[in-house]
């Protein structure tokens, strides 16, 4: 029983630290921004009690700083164990199918979100526009955030859940970690996509005991969304039918095409995702 309680407390602590690092990064970047604009330290602290510094630069810097702090802290404290064994196994074919799987999930996920008619909070929309509308935002959205989130939610949270429910089906741990991952986004607009992605990411972690496939899937997903946002500006506020020029038939065809990518990718990954062989 003591081990179970310790595991639960460990997971709670990981989540608290993850949130605290985001808050710390927000205040740190905001204060530095105000100091850079000529405000003294005391006045900056007082200003932040009732105001929020919001600009493309501060949003990007905050996201990048919190991600770097998260990666460094979790790995240095070994909350997320780091090993090169999976990469040394040269799983390039499996990672190729991970890329295809990620591409195949984007349109179905967007369609599902449309059917739920969940409104994106204005604050979240402003933050996403700030991140997506600046080329430097890709450093955070496309690279650092995938590594940080996989480090926390698969490398630490799911790993601990698997230990906590050892002897039971791994899917219990995968579902719980996916739910935690979805709720950690703190809004209903992102929860469905995050939960479904969490199931895939968790499944890949269990099959490989590595966060590398998850980072690749997460990277492709975020990179594709970033690219579409900048190449098709109407995608920011429009539905799929708007993106496809008002053709509902094109939407159905894109969904079918996505499934033709996603399902074979899942089949291939069910055969190819394996734990690295132990080094003799």
Regions found by a protein language model. Give the residues of each.
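Hydrophobic alpha-helical transmembrane segments
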Residues: 8-16, 60, 95-99, 135, ...
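Alpha-helical transmembrane segments in multi-pass membrane proteins
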Residues: 18-77, 96-97, 253-257
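Functionally important transmembrane alpha-helices
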Residues: 19, 23-31, 190-247
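Juxtamembrane helix-loop-helix connectors linking adjacent transmembrane helices
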Residues: 32, 39-54, 79-148, 156-163, ...
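C-terminal membrane module of polytopic membrane proteins
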Residues: 50, 219-280
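Structural signal for the C-terminal ends of transmembrane alpha-helices
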Residues: 72-82, 204-208, 263-273
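Hydrophobic residues within alpha-helical transmembrane segments
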Residues: 144, 176-180, 216, 220
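Membrane-interface helix/loop boundary segments of multi-pass membrane proteins
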Residues: 148-176, 203-210
């Amino acid at each position: 029983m003591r081990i179970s309680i310790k595991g639960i407390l460990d997971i709670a602590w990981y989540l608290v630290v993850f949130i605290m690092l985001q808050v710390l990064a927000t205040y740190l970047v905001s204060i530095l921004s105000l100091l850079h604009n000529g405000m003294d330290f005391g006045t900056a602290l007082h200003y932040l009690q009732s105001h929020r510094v919001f600009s493309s630069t501060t949003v990007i810097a905050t996201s990048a700083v919190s991600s770097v702090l998260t990666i460094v802290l979790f790995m240095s404290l070994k909350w997320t164990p780091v090993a090169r064994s999976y990469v040394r196994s040269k799983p390039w074919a499996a990672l190729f199918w991970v890329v295809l799987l990620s591409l195949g999930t984007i349109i179905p996920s967007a369609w599902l979100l449309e059917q739920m008619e969940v409104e994106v909070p204005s604050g979240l929309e402003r933050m996403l526009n700030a991140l997506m509308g600046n080329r430097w935002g890709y450093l955070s959205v496309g690279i650092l955030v995938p590594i940080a989130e996989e480090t926390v939610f698969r490398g630490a949270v799911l790993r601990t859940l698997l230990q906590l429910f050892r002897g039971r089906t791994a899917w219990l741990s995968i579902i719980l970690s996916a739910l935690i991952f979805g709720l950690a986004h703190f809004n209903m607009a992102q929860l469905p996509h995050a939960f479904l992605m969490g199931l895939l990411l968790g499944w890949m972690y269990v099959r490989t005991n590595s966060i590398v496939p998850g980072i690749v899937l997460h990277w492709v997903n975020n990179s594709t969304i970033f690219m579409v946002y900048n190449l098709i500006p109407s995608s920011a506020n429009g539905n799929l039918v708007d993106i496809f020029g008002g053709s509902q038939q094109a939407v159905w065809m894109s969904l079918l095409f996505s499934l033709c990518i996603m399902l074979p990718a899942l089949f291939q990954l069910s055969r190819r995702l394996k734990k690295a062989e132990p080094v003799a």
